[in-house]
């Protein structure tokens, strides 16, 4: 026994028990009335059915009594075995269990007890329900509904359509300055574009340019407007807006920034690095450097390229020289790759970006992806570092903050970013890395806010491009390429693979097969070898060039009539840049993609979602390849031997 008795307040529970008893009595009276009503309406049962019902009721009563006796015995045994200290808690738990709703078995037992009482008060010989099981089920339903009447039943809600969440883009992204896609029908004479100086107009005519493409006609005046007040200040003394350009490959983006930058720097007096163009590959940097050199020829402006093709010391000499113990810049415009640029910022003390006015980022989507090198943050740090200058220096630069009267006095040289890409991202996390200032977007598509389901990247396909996909098996891919070159005469053709090893194996296979000149273009080759290969391909000496994505990104290769995706690209950006090597400057071009059966569904959906004007199916009948199969099998055996020998050489 417990040492102290604890009287617990159980008033609410006792009140609930009394309420339940009164409720059951009312329900019993209601059931009796229903039995009388049904007895008057239904047809009287036969004596045999009545006997069966009576036997069924007695059987259930005996079964119920047996269960009750067993339960009492178990309870008595459990009470004897329990500790005295647990008696108070167990009694409270028993009372709490009474609050639970009645189970269906208990309800049926109550119905049977009510029926036995009804037999005494109701004439059994009268008509009863047609089925005792149906009668019990109805009673059970009534009892359960009455026992749960105190609880609020949830449900009955109308299904509503889920409202889609629309992306909310910044105004500069959602409302860009629209550029016409059709190049041929929107050519503008160079004399009609305002702001270009006569010297550059003559230079353009000398280089055979009589008209500007739509991108050039829109972007050149916008950049020239930002330098209308000179290099030291922006329009009205404010910092100029950054410029972003999203246009198809081959639409003339390079000339769109070369012309205004050269004109803006043509009036400079002291030579300093005032324009920096950063590009992802050495070949693309070489191409941009050549364009800058073509339009600075005959002027005092100097263009220097730092991509690692020369030694670090040679590049250091080209960038600056020491005269009278003082370092002097030898470059006005620097064209660089990110890795080499970071090397000069950290290791070349005479390399200064303190006077930088234009930061040009070409192939901006790929440059954003390479931010892990932190090249942009290091460039910004180098621009606003002022070693050896006092706080009262006229040309000192500080990191720009909020626009206030104090921050604008005294004025400082602004840094303007110029971004160019065929696949400009709309991902806010990536754009945040660029730290753009009130950017102005020039795009060949309209606002994207009307289509919230569209991806976060905007893609532009060349106007004259015809796209096809070729269903095939893995073993038939080389045969189809040979069929295209030898039978259909699709040349010059640029073929893309997903790996450097794949490009090399395909190159060896086509070379062993014979009948067509082939070359490979990958990072495996030296810069000199790649430059020579490109020149031979442009001259028509090589009808088939097999390349990787990294090597050919953004390069303007003249005369490419056909692009073949030997390996299907995994990402839409890769596909856009591959097919962008043809159909450039408004010309026509073909693009073929070899697809395995498992790749078709995903690839076609990816291209369709990106806004492709339409990709068609191109069948290659097996009969067209049979004549080459015997020679192809011999070549495969030879290829296996050559690859094995090359792998053995790599080990030693």
UniProtKB/Swiss-Prot annotation:
Its main location: nucleus. It is found in: Nucleus, Nucleolus. One of its GO terms (biological process) is rRNA processing. Residues 480-626 form the Helicase C-terminal domain. Pfam families: DEAD, Helicase_C. InterPro entries: DEAD/DEAH_box_helicase_dom, Helicase_ATP-bd, Helicase_C-like, P-loop_NTPase, RNA-helicase_DEAD-box_CS. One of its GO terms (molecular function) is RNA helicase activity. The keyword Chaperone does not apply. Residues 234-442 form the Helicase ATP-binding domain. SMART domains: DEXDc, HELICc. This is ATP-dependent RNA helicase DDX51.
């Amino acid at each position: 026994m417990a040492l102290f008795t604890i009287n617990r307040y159980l008033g609410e529970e006792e009140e609930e028990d009394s309420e339940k008893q009164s409720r059951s009595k009312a329900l019993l009276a209601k059931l009796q009335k229903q039995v009388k009503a049904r007895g008057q309406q239904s047809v009287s049962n036969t004596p045999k059915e009545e006997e069966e019902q009576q036997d069924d009721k007695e059987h259930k009563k005996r079964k119920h009594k047996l269960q009750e006796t067993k339960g009492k015995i178990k309870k008595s045994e459990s009470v004897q075995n329990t500790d005295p200290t647990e008696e108070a808690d167990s009694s409270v738990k028993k009372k709490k269990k009474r609050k639970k709703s009645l189970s269906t078995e208990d309800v049926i037992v109550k119905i049977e007890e009510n029926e036995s009482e009804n037999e005494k008060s109701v004439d059994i010989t009268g008509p009863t329900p047609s089925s005792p099981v149906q009668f019990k089920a109805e009673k059970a339903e009534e009892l359960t509904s009455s026992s749960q009447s105190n609880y609020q039943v949830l449900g009955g809600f109308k299904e509503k359509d889920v409202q889609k969440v629309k992306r909310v883009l910044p105004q500069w992204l959602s409302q860009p300055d629209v550029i016409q896609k059709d190049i041929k029908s929107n050519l503008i004479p160079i004399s009609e574009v305002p702001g270009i100086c006569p010297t550059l107009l003559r230079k353009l005519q000398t280089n055979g340019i009589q008209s500007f493409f739509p991108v050039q006609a829109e972007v050149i005046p916008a950049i020239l407007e930002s330098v209308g007040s000179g290099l030291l200040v922006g329009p009205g003394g404010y910092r100029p807006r950054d410029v972003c350009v999203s246009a198809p490959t081959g639409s003339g983006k390079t000339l769109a920034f070369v012309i205004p930058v050269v004109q803006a720097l043509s009036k400079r007096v002291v030579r300093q690095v005032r324009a920096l163009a950063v590009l992802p590959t050495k070949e693309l940097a070489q191409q941009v450097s050549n364009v800058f050199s073509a339009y600075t020829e005959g002027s005092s402006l100097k263009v220097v390229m730092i991509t690692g093709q020369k030694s670090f010391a040679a590049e250091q000499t080209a960038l600056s020289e020491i005269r009278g113990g003082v370092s002097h810049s030898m470059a006005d415009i620097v064209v660089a790759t990110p890795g080499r640029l970071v090397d000069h910022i950290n290791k070349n003390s005479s390399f200064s970006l303190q006077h930088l006015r234009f930061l040009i980022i070409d192939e901006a989507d790929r440059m954003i992806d390479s931010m892990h090198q932190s090249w942009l943050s290091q460039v910004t740090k180098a621009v606003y570092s002022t070693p050896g200058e006092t706080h009262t220096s006229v040309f000192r630069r500080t990191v720009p903050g909020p626009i206030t009267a104090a921050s604008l006095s005294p004025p400082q040289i602004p840094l303007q970013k110029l971004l160019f890409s065929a696949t400009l991202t709309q991902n806010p996390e990536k754009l945040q890395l660029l730290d753009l200032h009130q950017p102005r977007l020039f795009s060949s598509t309209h606002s994207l806010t009307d289509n919230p389901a569209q991806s976060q990247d905007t893609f532009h396909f060349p106007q004259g491009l015809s796209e096809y996909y070729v269903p095939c098996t893995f073993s038939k891919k080389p045969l189809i390429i040979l069929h295209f070159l030898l039978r259909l005469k699709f040349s010059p053709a640029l073929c893309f693979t997903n790996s450097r090893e794949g490009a090399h194996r395909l190159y060896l296979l086509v070379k062993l097969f014979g009948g067509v000149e082939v070359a490979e273009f990958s990072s495996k080759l030296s810069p000199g070898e790649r430059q020579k290969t490109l020149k031979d391909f442009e001259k028509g000496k090589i009808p088939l060039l097999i390349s990787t994505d990294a090597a050919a990104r953004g390069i303007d290769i003249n005369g490419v009539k056909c692009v073949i995706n030997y390996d299907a690209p995994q990402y839409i950006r890769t596909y856009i840049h591959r097919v962008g090597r043809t159909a450039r400057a408004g010309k026509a071009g073909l693009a073929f993609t070899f697809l395995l059966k498992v790749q078709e569904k995903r690839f076609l959906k990816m291209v369709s979602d990106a806004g492709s004007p339409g990709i068609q199916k191109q069948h290659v009948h097996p009969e067209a390849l049979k004549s080459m199969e015997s020679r192809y099998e011999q070549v495969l055996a030879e290829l296996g031997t050559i690859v094995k020998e090359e792998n053995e050489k790599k080990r030693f």
